[in-house]
Regions:
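Residue-level "edge-of-site" marker
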Residues: 51-52, 108, 135
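Vicinal oxygen chelate
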Residues: 20-29, 70-98, 113-118, 123
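N-terminal beta-strand motif that seeds the catalytic metal site of vicinal oxygen chelate
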Residues: 2-33, 79-81, 131-135
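Conserved S-adenosyl-L-methionine
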Residues: 103-107
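Short Pro/Gly-enriched beta-strand edge/turn motifs at strand-loop
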Residues: 34, 98-100
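Core segments of cupin and vicinal oxygen chelate
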Residues: 16-19, 25-62
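Conserved short beta-strand elements that form part of the metal-binding/catalytic scaffold
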Residues: 44-78, 124-130
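Short, small/polar residue-rich loop motifs at catalytic or cofactor-binding pockets
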Residues: 48, 110-112
Length: 135
């Protein structure tokens, strides 16, 4: 099995490389409602310099309005963004107490636990926890 360090050191010879995912664009039709949800409901850390950015660890959720860029609003559906948490059942209970509704029950894949829900704009998110420790 390859380690993370093997993957980090791999580089195609003589080519520019993609270094990492810099942010996830969170489409919204109501930026203030989204900021409140990601900050107050999910507990993401707001950026002190950019009101449209919320942080989960090293990942930035960039709240944006596609319609202001001449694009149609389309919620992220069918491939929920996984949010790692220490205990899916406990976090689900916390979010349900704040009014978040989940799609079905929490499920066990044999590798991890997952519970799927959506933000107020319909963008699908997932609470996630793998059994194996992260390297």
């Amino acid at each position: 099995m390859r380690s993370h360090s093997d993957r980090d050191s791999w580089q195609p010879h003589g080519m520019a490389v993609i270094e990492r995912l810099d942010f996830l664009g969170v489409p919204t039709q109501d930026p203030e409602r989204s900021r409140v949800f990601y900050r107050d409901v999910l507990g993401l850390r707001p950026d002190e310099h950019a009101e449209w950015e919320q942080w989960a660890g090293d990942t930035c959720f960039g709240i944006w309005e596609p319609e202001k860029q001449g694009m149609p609003f389309v919620a992220q559906k069918g491939n929920p963004w996984p949010l790692r948490c220490d205990d899916v059942a406990e976090m689900r209970a916390v979010l349900e107490a704040k009014g978040v509704q989940f799609f079905g029950e929490t499920f066990d894949t044999g590798v991890c636990h997952m519970a799927i829900f959506a933000d107020p704009d319909g963008n699908e998110l997932m609470l996630h926890r793998r059994y194996a420790p992260y390297e």
